[in-house]
Amino acid sequence: ILAAPTWHKSPNWQMSMQHNAREGGLFVVSTCMAIRKDDIPDKYDFKNLYPEGRDWINPGNSCIIDPKGQVIAGPLEAEEGILYADIDLNTITEAKRMFDVVGHYSRPDVFNFSIKTNQ
């Protein structure tokens, strides 16, 4: 399980997390900060830099992704909460069979990796 805390909230971040899940054959828990304008105390002047009527400074978008890259919980957008998901550890094996990043199914008859040590 990869825990990936972030401030980032865009759909691109979620796609990156889906890629990480597939490439690593692992579950990803993407925890994104959700913060409202009202969460900032009035004593901080920078609070006024946010436009009027904007409730959320960062809407969060936390999610849980399985090893096949599928979102199995969330995204939790513009709300506070806790995400839960039942995970099947067999999914890890299935995912790693489909996408082998370390090359267990590489073809030694086609590809050869060697290092010259005499130079």
Model-derived regions, located:
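CN hydrolase (nitrilase-like) catalytic-core segments centered on the catalytic cysteine
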Residues: I1-D86
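Cysteine/selenocysteine-centered motifs that mediate thiol-based redox chemistry or coordinate metal-sulfur cofactors
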Residues: I92-Q119
